[in-house]
Amino acid sequence: MYTQAIDLAPGANPVRPEAASARDAAFEAAIAQDRKVEAQDWMPEGYRKTLVRQISQHAHSEVVGMLPEGNWVTRAPSLKRKAILLAKIQDEGGHGLYLYAAAETLGVARDDLIDALLSGRAKYSSIFNYPAPSWADMGAIGWLVDGAAIMNQILSLIHI
């Protein structure tokens, strides 16, 4: 049930569906019927926590993804490519801001999410930890990351 078993302490048992409250059962039924759940709607705390973790990880990846690209702004092979790279960096920052705003609607403070990133408690896409010593490396990393994101989005649409 929404990956909360990952967060369990060793030896702990997850809550069994039969032990869940009527409110939990109603929420599970709504999910099973593919009903939309809005941020202000009641949801189990584990579900909300998982959403915040997923959204913040995505936001952090957008922001951290700007860093290797930013290193290449002054070394881009042409003015046209420099302008394209600056636009891509700006897009990544904007995506991160949108995602932080979405997480805030779930009741967390943006400052807390950023503090978790800066302290190393939060996760982000590890591909950005690898060096991009050439313009081609930087392009390949961007292509692979964006391509993987597009495939995830397409596959999620297929399974609707």
Task: Name these PLM-found stretches.
Residues L8-A26, A122-P131, A149-L157:
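Short, highly charged low-complexity linear segments
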